[in-house]
Amino acid sequence: MSTKAERLMSDVRAPSPLQSSAKTSARIGWIDVARGIGIILVVAGHAAGGIIDGPGGQSTPWLRYAFLALYTFHMPVFFFLAGLFVVERLERGTAAFVKAILITIVYPYFLWSIIQFSLIYASGSLVNHPVETYWATIIALPWRTVSQFWFLHALFLVHLLGLAAWRTGGRAAVLAAAVAVKLVAMFVPSTPALSLAAGNAPYYALGLAIGWQRASTVFDTMSDRLRIGTGLCALLAIILLCSEADQLQNMLRVETASSSGIARIAWMPAMLPATLLGGATLLIIASALAQSGGRISQLLERIGKLSMPIFLMHILFIAGTRIFATHIFHVAGASLLPLLVAVGVGGPLLVKAATDRIGASKSLGLR
């Protein structure tokens, strides 16, 4: 296993002493597998969202409910994973921690927000949501996010929250601060960027409080009955809450809402049981696959290590493929989903391999 592999989706990497240990690398392989599963779900979610918002999107109610179920848990998992190694990194000093998140979060956030938004602006009516203003959006990037890059913006903010709270009172202070900001965001109107960061802060804090070692021990020693039971409970919770989603939100209906509207339903407080159980099930599956050591596990682990390039570029590949298929071949709807997911994962990996060969990955924020 490469000691320079991209260990976490954003800026989170295991400390170098841990990376040099084969035993430790084996123990944390499930984290990369979880990240691999998670980034595939992210790509699938955005591919489904593009179909929902595109021509004929209202004719696929099953896809809408699948999108709703997916959005209840897949991003909270990434915030949890992002917190697992934070304490070790904080112990190396504030300056090193801040420098790392500036390089691995802030720089890619601005660079790829500008690249992607510029292409969207240039595409005009070919995209699902054309934009008319350019510079106003670019100038506002420090406080108003575009597309999927809200995750990097939110992760940067929760890292700052974690840094401040941890220096004050350790893990308990981080948990308390995260719960506090989430409660405030629930009752005090704020900007979308701040609300997204506050809403996901507890998952990050939970990962930070548990740490990768405790998490690995829990999943390594979990009984088969508990694994299966958690999965069944997650399935029941997601089915129940998704079936009642229209009653949870007066202004939106799953079968008519846009993808962003469905996402707002998925992120409602009432969906918390589905969020926790769905996320736990994903992690349990990742742990079981990592322990099996099969080809699927190895593939997912590799994808997990390269999840940052996939995250940064998948929308460009998905949108480009969908536009090409719709306008050239007149193919639209859910039948495009497998192709979009394959291109959304595979395209960025090809770009990453090419930039590695020419030594451009670092300057593009891909490593």
Predicted feature descriptions by range:
Residues 2-367:
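Alpha-helical transmembrane segments and their immediate juxtamembrane cytosolic regions
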